[in-house]
Amino acid sequence: MSKGFEDIFKQLDADFFCLQETKCQPDQVDLSFDGYYQFFNSAERKGYSSTAIFSRKKPLSVSYDFDDMTDHPKEGRIITLEFEKFYLVTAYVPNSKDQLLRIDYRLQWEQAMVRHLNSLKQKKAVIYCGDLNVAHNEIDLKNPDINHFNAGFSDQEREAFTNLLSNGYIDTYRFLYPNKVEYSWWSYRSRAREKNIGWRIDYFVVSEDLKDKIIEAKIHNQIYGSDHCPVELDIDL
């Protein structure tokens, strides 16, 4: 990881950093972040997918992936940390690919994630974050009219996110800012970021019992270094 990443890490000074699509194995990471516990879930295929969490607080337990991975390839997409009052789950949701070639698996994965989150929510509050690879509503991307059949804005993916929220979860950014237009991802093509032709596909979602604890949700679109920018949740726990 680059020196620029370390600078951003220290600048944001968060209690938890959740990273997606790290594309690395733990032995490839050379970071000197004192005071953070580090957790990695790496794909079997090197240089692909993968997730990581850096936490100032030691978790009570750590788990990786779904409990039942029978129908899921080992792509390193999920990390779950348990703390005294809440669970923290980060995920890199599978992309449905061009022409929605992977949509069936994507929807299967979404159903498994709802089951996973609901099983946690029965025990304590849940914070779910990451690259969720969906722009939920038309306000969440620059050009909705031409993207209804594209990965990330298909009716199926949007309905899956609606279903997640209907299970007792809140999109924290949209909860605070129902009409604000900001994006968290821009294609590398056609100078999309320069033109702000973006999508909001990175989220912090929380269980409804945390609604009154939400203080702020931010999209740090002033930070460069990736096709995504960091998103932040400030919550009183």
State what each model feature region is.
Residues 22, 132, 229:
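Active-site metal-binding loops of divalent metal-dependent hydrolases
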Residues 1-11:
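Short, acidic/polar
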Residues 218-237:
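Surface polyanion/phosphate-binding segment centered on an Asp-His-Pro turn
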Residues 13-16, 37, 109-197, 201:
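Metal-dependent phosphoesterases centered on the DNase I-like endonuclease/exonuclease/phosphatase
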Residues 46-62, 191-212:
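Conserved beta strand-loop-helix elements of the APE1-like EEP
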Residues 56, 81-84, 207-208, 233-237:
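Active-site beta-strand termini and strand-to-loop segments that position acidic
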Residues 67-69, 94-110, 146-149:
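Surface-exposed cleft-lining segments at the edges of enzyme active sites
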Residues 22-23, 28-96:
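Structured beta-strand-rich core segments of catalytic domains in phosphoester-bond hydrolases
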